[in-house]
Amino acid sequence: MIKIKRKTAPPPVEQDSDSDSSFDEEEPQDLEVQEGPVTDSSDEEAASSSKKTAKQGEASEDLKEEDDDDDEEENDDDDEEEDDDDDDDKKTRIPVLNPLSWMRNKEQRLALYKKMKKEKHKKKMQERRARRKAGVPANPGHTIESLREKDQTEVANLNDSDNEELQKELQLDDFSSYFERSYEPKVLITFADNPVTKTRKFGLELSRIFPNALVKIRNKSSVKKICKSAEREEFTDVVIVNEDRRKPNGLLVIHLPNGPTAHFKLSNVKLTSDIKRDHKEITKHRPEVILNNFTTRLGLTVGRMLGALFHHDPEFRGRRAVTFHNQRDYIFFRHHRYEFTKEGKRVKLRELGPRFTLKLRSLQEGTFDSKTGDYAWIISNKRHAMESRRRFFL
């Protein structure tokens, strides 16, 4: 290592004013160069500190590179999320501009609206024709029935091998003797105390529907007494029509002698005269009974109970058909007669009446007992307060 030492300059010499030159040339300074190792301790400490700082600098550069890579990855993810958010914002925030809203002239706006509506209908019909030509089925869309919550007790096919236990239960239930044809149904129809005219007419029309039915006035008797007297007179079922505000609003069906008892809400009652029909069109032939869409275990019991009110051998010559159609836990009742054309190739239905809708409120085991009776099923709350609107029980 080379060390350079600088000698100090001598003090300046005062010159006389009589000298010829105003400026004196400065003498060059001598520099001494020494060769050899440096023995100064401060230099060694500076060298070691420089090495340490170099190593620390390299380590810090490596950390900075890793941090930069992580920051770049995070920035890329943030950019992707921001792009997705921007796409969503673009989809939701862009308003749909209607050209009609910019027109102030009412006549021109109406003419343009009719033109746009006509073009839209024309385009829709073209798409429908193209779809039919290609053989593509139309989209059925969603309904409450298609979105219905699946019930664990749903019965798809009663004759299936998976439903052997259910078949054994049905062979031992309260309606097994009816389906074995061991007796002929006999129905007693009565009313609440002091029924109004419309309620009496409705009970009379029920007697035209149910074969072997008898209508009697209640005479302020309790339901238990009515059941005991009906059992003595060999009635198999009791139907009690309740009323409120001078309208029939409830139906109590009791199967004798051991129950069960079903309470229905009655609504949308239309008598034969209300649908402009004559009761003389209703013949005395035993009708054919159609039970539709009772798919659950509870629905199967209710359907068997309603079917047990009719004779098990219908008379097809009378061409009468009685339908109990369950839809969204509402049971729609219709009474028709099917008529053939002169050629005998086509058939049409003629409604005879009455027409009403049933809604199951409770199903009680045994005969009617409001105090100590056991309920197999009872409605819990109003429809709008239930936990799900897509859950049905029948």
Swiss-Prot record:
It holds the Pfam family Brix. Its main location: nucleus. It comes from the Eukaryota. It is found in: Nucleus, Nucleolus. Residues 15-33, 59-88 have a biased composition (Acidic residues). Residues 347-364 are annotated as: RNA-binding. Residues 1-98, 116-152 are annotated as: Disordered. Residues 185-369 form the Brix domain. Residues 116-134 have a biased composition (Basic residues). GO terms for molecular function: RNA binding; rRNA primary transcript binding. Keywords: Nucleus, Ribosome biogenesis, RNA-binding, rRNA processing, rRNA-binding. GO terms for biological process: maturation of 5.8S rRNA; maturation of LSU-rRNA; ribosome biogenesis. SMART domains: Brix. Gene3D superfamilies: Probable brix-domain ribosomal biogenesis protein. One of its GO terms (cellular component) is preribosome, large subunit precursor. PANTHER family: RIBOSOME PRODUCTION FACTOR 1, U3 SMALL NUCLEOLAR RIBONUCLEOPROTEIN PROTEIN IMP4. May be required for ribosome biogenesis. This is Probable ribosome production factor 1. It comes from Drosophila melanogaster.
